[in-house]
From Swiss-Prot:
Similarity annotation: Belongs to the phosphoenolpyruvate carboxykinase [GTP] family.
Organism: Anaeromyxobacter sp. (strain K)
Subunit composition and interactions: Monomer.
Catalytic residues of the enzyme: 258
Cellular component GO terms held in the UniProt record: cytosol
Record's keyword annotation contains DNA repair: no
Cited Pfam families: PEPCK_GTP, PEPCK_N
Catalysed reactions, semicolon-separated: oxaloacetate + GTP = phosphoenolpyruvate + GDP + CO2
Record-given protein name: Phosphoenolpyruvate carboxykinase [GTP]
Entry binding sites for Mn(2+): 214, 234, 283
Region Disordered: start-end pairs: 362-388
Physiological role: Catalyzes the conversion of oxaloacetate (OAA) to phosphoenolpyruvate (PEP), the rate-limiting step in the metabolic pathway that produces glucose from lactate and other precursors derived from the citric acid cycle.
Record-linked PROSITE patterns: PEPCK_GTP
Length: 596
């Protein structure tokens, strides 16, 4: 077994001992330590092209861009094979899959044993967060996938910078990953919060294999945050600059397919001249209390791992600019001459394509050319609207926290919480509608507290209690809001135009955070009222706006019944203040119905 480059570029005994131990288990032919340099990126890319792991795109149209298609059984996160391995099942809680740690190490160890024979073991040191920030966390991912190593080079600050930050410390996340035989029957993603360790085997897909992303930055980090008194959240961070030059920062949590990246990269409508929205982050926020008593946030990532289908110049021009160079496209469709396409792109599909499975595809086919979860991995620095503070080690001060799900009924366009506890209640009960295929029942609400349901690294009730406990740590807390861009008319049409016009709602929230906008008190929270939103230049009827902001008491009685079932699922660790918030709202709704 050989080791390169420069043999071992660290003298950290903790790290060297662990790498040796993992090499002994996985038995690679060669160990390669990544340094994060441009020369290395070119060399690894050439290796990946030679091995047909990557296919170069037309370098005139897509400079520095490459295409990858995964195994057809390996296209998304696998929640049912994702485990939290805590000493007791209660510590993982009722919303996570649990495996006893010794059993998990034994079970996965048997799969890892010899899994890298004939392969290179890449040692990928990386930092989540600006490398000089007190927020920063170091991880080391060992992987047998050059695709993973190259993606980690985009998504995190990778290589020498991480080893320099680590020094001789033992405080690093130990991540072991092998594609192994990519067998769904031998696929496990296991998190060991007490050991600051992640073992992932049998998948090469982003969320399962890029261990810095969901695994460390949310599941492990949420556990560390609970113990250390901060928040690791599934939230975008955006900077809003007014025409007068005032800058405010918000963090927003939306579940998948609810427009997080679009909101983070929003372009204000023509009716808002002089306003600028810049991206600090599009997916993850780490937040700590600053010396001034405010909540400060950093984006731990260094790139965007975005869903391609539906992304176009209308929905997200900044994302389209971000992927123009040095991007890896996974499971989109491509043309034989090195162009790419996906459903929802600005132009119609070409007559013939190679689909995401590598098969010929003709226009008019009922099959999707690009996989619905096909992705782009793009460097954050490509974003023309990136915030200049994206690498600031202090982070940015958060004025508002926004929660939002996808609800066709019930939840109005925007609400401001009465207080922190009420805001945590709104976040704890947020969710999105699904179709229950077995019953054909449409509109079943999948609760997704703070958009974190698949990513909480410990018991959900304890996580919500941590949110409540944070109030005493934040002398100057941000205001909390709930939004719903997705309410529909009786005919099934969206009532609110969304996209850039969400700026109108954002402006009201920013003004409320600054203490300069009026609001109307309702039984659900504060709302803008009839005149609170700036609607000039908006081609939407007054009736549609009224319907988007309406509070229907009958719908809320049903909603509170559904919330009761959700709270029962959380069991005995559900914080009593959240149950009380539900009970108080139910009383307000019933009292209002009697008055009516």
């Amino acid at each position: 077994m050989s080791t390169s480059p420069a043999a071992r570029p660290t003298s950290n005994a903790h790290l060297l001992g662990w790498v040796d131990e993992m090499a002994k288990l996985c038995k690679p032919d060669r160990v390669y330590w990544c340094d994060g340099s441009e020369a290395e990126k070119k060399r690894l890319t050439d290796d990946a092209v030679a091995a047909k792991v990557l296919i170069p795109l037309d370098q005139q149209k897509w400079p520095g861009c490459h295409y990858h298609h995964s195994n057809s059984s390996d296209v998304a996160r696998v929640e049912h094979l994702t485990f939290i391995c805590t000493p007791t099942k209660e510590q993982a809680g009722p919303t996570n899959n649990w495996m006893e740690p010794k059993e998990a190490y034994r079970k996965l160890g048997a799969i890892f044993d010899g899994s890298m024979k004939g392969r290179t073991m890449y040692v990928v040191p990386y930092v989540m967060g600006p490398s000089t920030s007190p927020f920063a966390k170091v991880g080391i991912e060992i992987t047998d996938s050059v695709y993973v190593a190259l993606n980690m080079g985009i998504m995190a600050r990778m290589g020498k910078v991480a080893l320099d930050r680590l020094g001789d410390s033992d405080e690093f996340n130990r991540g072991l990953h092998s594609v192994a035989d990519c067998n769904p029957e031998r696929r496990f993603i296991c998190h060991f919060p007490q050991d600051n360790t992640i073992w992932s085997v049998g998948s090469g897909y982003g969320g399962n294999a890029l261990l810095g992303k969901k695994c460390l930055a949310l599941r492990i980090a949420s556990y560390l945050a609970k113990n250390e008194g901060w928040l690791a959240e599934h939230m975008l961070i955006l900077e809003a600059e007014s025409p007068t030059g005032e800058k405010q920062y918000v963090a927003a949590a939306f579940p998948s397919a609810c427009g997080k990246t679009n909101f983070a990269m929003m372009i204000p409508p023509a009716a808002f001249p002089g306003w600028k929205i810049r991206t600090v982050g599009d997916d993850i926020s780490w937040m700590r209390v600053g010396e001034d008593g405010r909540l400060w946030a950093v984006n731990p990532e260094n790139g965007y791992f975005g869903v391609a289908p539906g992304t176009n110049r209308k929905t997200n021009p900044n994302a389209m600019d971000s992927v123009r160079k040095d991007t890896i496209f996974t499971n989109v469709a491509r043309t034989p001459d090195g162009d790419i396409w996906w459903e929802g792109m600005d132009h119609e599909a070409p007559a013939e394509l190679i689909d995401w499975k590598g098969q010929p595809w003709k226009k008019g086919s009922t099959e999707k050319a690009a996989h619905p979860n096909s992705r782009f991995t793009a460097p954050a620095k490509n974003n023309p609207a990136i915030s200049p503070l994206v690498d600031d080690p202090k982070g940015v001060p958060i004025s508002a926290i926004i929660f939002g799900g996808r609800r066709s009924t019930t939840v109005p366009l925007v609400l401001e919480a009465f207080n922190w506890t009420h805001g945590v209640y709104l976040g704890s009960t947020m969710g999105s509608e699904t179709t229950a295929a077995a019953t054909g029942q449409v509109g079943v609400v999948r609760r997704d507290p703070m958009a974190m349901l698949p990513f909480i690294g410990y018991d959900c009730g304890s996580y919500l209690q941590h949110w409540l406990d944070m109030q005493s740590r934040i002398p100057n807390p941000p205001k909390i809001f709930l939004v719903n861009w997705f309410r529909k008319s009786a005919e099934g049409k969206f009532l609110w135009p969304g996209y850039g016009d969400n700026m109108r709602v954002l402006k009201w929230m920013l003004d409320r955070a600054a203490g300069r906008a009026p609001a109307q008190e309702t039984l659900l929270g504060y709302t803008p009222g009839d005149a609170g939103l700036d609607l000039h230049g908006l081609d939407v009827s007054k009736d549609a706006i009224a319907a988007a902001t309406r509070i229907d008491l009958g719908e809320w009685e049903q909603e509170l019944e559904s919330q009761s079932e959700w709270f029962e699922k959380l069991g005995k660790t559900l914080p009593r203040p959240l149950a009380l918030q539900r009970e108080l709202l139910l009383e307000r709704v019933r009292a209002a119905r009697k008055v009516k």
